[in-house]
A protein has these predicted regions:
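Disordered, acidic Ser/Thr/Pro-rich linker "stalks" and the adjacent N-terminal cap
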Residues: 96-162, 175-180, 250-262
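Solvent-exposed loop/turn segments flanking beta-strands in beta-repeat/beta-sandwich domains
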Residues: 22-50, 180-184
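Pro/Thr/Ser/Gly-rich low-complexity, intrinsically disordered linker/stalk tracts
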Residues: 1-33, 88-113, 250-253
Length: 262
């Protein structure tokens, strides 16, 4: 189109507030007189002008990396013809949805877990003592009771710490052969060893293979605790027992990035 360009009316534009984004939608009359539009706004985070070019056939534009805390964003629409001649600009205001905070974790120091800190509710009497979980030998193993009488799941490994912890990660390695690893875990904490609180369920992502290793994501218990249980609620193969080669627990560092409150 080479005639005089005319920008669409403000009434033709609607907006959607999305998490950390604004979606602009508009209609274009059938008799529109332009070839393309420029849609510009000033980013309040750095005061830089951002310009997007859209064709006459475009009907929507997603503006990402926006924040609700900035309130109104002012968008300037301006039509152009094929000769890059500009029509009169038009402005509309729109707001962003709230950008959720992001949380990341990094592994900290390994906690010194010794055999006397470990216990279970279902030790196999003939082999696989729980102390093997911290002996550093990948070919030894801990085993809950496979001999008769078997105890149905859930079954647990308990760690009684010598000091309080709150943000942590755990790691384990499956047995080398004849492995029966956890498929589902319930992570529980306590401060007296009698009253327990579930803080996380892990229902996917655990490994089934021989010698496979698993490192949990960071877990924030929400408060300090001195006792930890890894409660196995389901095993691969739906057995009434499980085994592991090694177990370790780490303190973890939690970082919260919340630009809406910076």
């Amino acid at each position: 189109y080479t005639g005089a360009p005319k920008t669409i009316d403000a009434s033709a534009v609607t907006s959607e507030a999305l998490p950390g984004a604004i979606r602009l939608n508009w209609t274009v009359p059938a008799d529109s007189t332009f070839s393309y539009m420029k849609i510009s706004y000033v980013n309040p985070a750095n005061q830089e002008t951002v310009t997007n070019v859209v064709s006459i056939h475009t009907r929507t534009l997603l503006i990402e990396n926006t924040l609700k805390k900035y309130g109104d964003y002012t968008f300037t629409f301006q039509a152009f013809n094929d000769k890059n001649e500009a029509g009169a600009p038009m402005q509309v205001k729109a707001q962003s949805g709230l950008l959720p905070a992001t949380v990341t974790y990094s592994k900290g120091d390994k906690i010194n877990v010794t055999a006397d800190m470990l216990s279970t509710d279902d030790q196999e009497p003939s082999e696989g003592p729980i102390k093997n979980l911290v002996d550093g030998n990948y070919n030894s193993f801990f085993h809950t009771r496979w001999s008769s009488p078997q105890k149905p799941l859930p079954q647990y490994i308990q760690v009684d710490f010598k000091e309080a912890h709150q943000v942590f990660m755990f790691w384990y390695r499956n047995r080398n052969g004849s492995q029966v690893g956890p498929e589902n875990l319930d992570i529980q904490i306590s401060n007296d060893g009698d009253n327990w609180e579930s803080i996380k369920e892990i229902l996917s992502g655990l490994p089934s293979a021989s010698q496979a290793e698993y490192t949990s994501e960071g877990i924030d218990a929400g408060k300090p605790f001195t006792h930890l249980r890894l409660v196995v609620t389901k095993t691969f193969g739906d057995r009434n027992y499980f085994n592991l080669a090694e177990l370790a627990v780490f303190d973890a560092h939690k970082v919260v990035y919340d630009p809406e409150n910076e």
